[in-house]
Amino acid sequence: MSDAAIADALAARGFALAPEFLRPDEVAALRGVALQRRATGEFHAARIGRGAGARRDPALRGDEICWLDEASAPERALLARFEALREALNRALFLGLTALEAHYACYGAGTGYARHLDRFRDDDTRAISLVLYLNEAWRAGDGGELRLFASEDAREPALVIAPRGGTLVALRSDTIAHEVLPARRERWSIAAWLRRRSDADALR
């Protein structure tokens, strides 16, 4: 799926699915970097909330994370690709996206992430969320699906996505609720957010 098609899907439905956003060799390279960084102790348990109120709650969120940087060639290439997508979305949708942040996420067997929105109630800067999967040979029985809901109150998912390597999911951070179902094996991904200036900053 082209960047233009991702923009069209976001405008029409609030989410987009790009099954072959990265090639298998690119996925393998990023997974290798993630495994190496985890082996050197760079991952830590994720928290929910932000600031002083952030807390660890494995019943709600069970992943370990590590923020991407530009120390390796695979990470630099991916961040450049995300930057190109950010620019394309700005051209097509006039979103005013100004920044990007991204981290690896590793869910152990039996862990998931309860239904939530990515935009914090007291921080409106997250505009578009991205999820890129790094798993190899993911099978139907492995679980770990991402379920997207068209609104915060929707009862049934609009889309259920298997976390197959190379697949990219883009969604609106403010309206598309989502959850990660528990997996039966380790589940690897990269989560990223395209950010804009806050409404409060824009009024200054």
Specify the residue positions occupied by each region the protein language model found:
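Fe(II)/2-oxoglutarate oxygenase catalytic core
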Residues: 1-129, 133-168, 174-204
